Amino acid sequence: MPEPMVATKQMIEQIFDGAATSYDRTGPSIFTQFGTRLVEQMPLTPGARVLDIGTGTGAVLLPVARRVGSEGHVTGIDLSGAILQEAERAVRAEGLTNVELRKMDAEHLEFPDQTFDVVICAFGLFLFPDMEAALREMNRVSKPGGYTGVSIFGKTPPPFNPGWPILFQQIAAYQVGVRMPQPIAYAPEEVEALLSQFGFRSIETRSEMNDIIYASAEDWWAFQLTLGTRATILRMNEETRARFKDEYLAKLRPMFRQDGLHLSVAVVYAMAQR
């Protein structure tokens, strides 16, 4: 069986450009939930300068901007110009004036050394072809004693269990897979080891289990078109895609409860200092 194609930066940009208007707006808006949870754990103070890497539509950016106040400043960066436009709309809707949005590669941050009090990257590490470069850059732009926070899917159980394991089995059978540049799930000790390797200290990790409910099969399928899985789905021609979807959702329907499809999602949160 052929190996799945590995997503390039250009592909990742195209994925999120295409998904921008529906990103985190299908089903329960999990990235807003998880972004808020990450921000709650960060030692943010009024007046802080913060960098949000892979800002998306603002799941972390918006609560951070509220926390640091008008004297603080938040810079959100992303590879996707279209998704930054959605973030800009959200910023304007809240009337926030302490936010800057920039199209930028996390592996080549365009900031001087020791610029930020806090650096945050929510669900972004697995999107970086050169994760080591991104982590080095995160450390470089942090002030001495500054804080870095990351979140990523946990390994146990597999993310979105049982929805994703069944999906990935079917993708393998169809031989159309596009995988992200890095593994998408990590154990807490693996996240700690990564941060330690690139100069971070005083590392704290915690894993939290979440029961995520999608009210309908169509909501869950629509969610797949807002993630890296979008690239795999769109590689199929229209006829194959329709057959794939029907087969996949047929496998899931017996698992639905009265209120929808329950999926287990472990999230690893980590905080460290430079």
Task: Locate the predicted segments by residue.
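Short glycine-dipeptide loop
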Residues: 47, 70-71, 142-147
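A short acidic, Gly/Pro-enriched loop at the edge of an enzyme's catalytic core
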Residues: 107-118
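Conserved hydrophobic residues forming the short capping helix/wall of the S-adenosyl-L-methionine
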Residues: 68, 90-91, 171, 195, ...
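Conserved Class I S-adenosyl-L-methionine
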Residues: 3-12, 30, 57-59, 182-274
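Class I SAM-dependent methyltransferase SAM/SAH-binding core
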Residues: 49-109, 133
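Conserved class I S-adenosyl-L-methionine
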Residues: 2-48, 59-63, 83-86, 93-94, ...
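Conserved catalytic/acceptor-binding region of the Class I
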Residues: 132-133, 139, 143, 147-215, ...
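A short SAM/SAH-binding and catalytic strip from SAM-dependent methyltransferases
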Residues: 117-131, 154
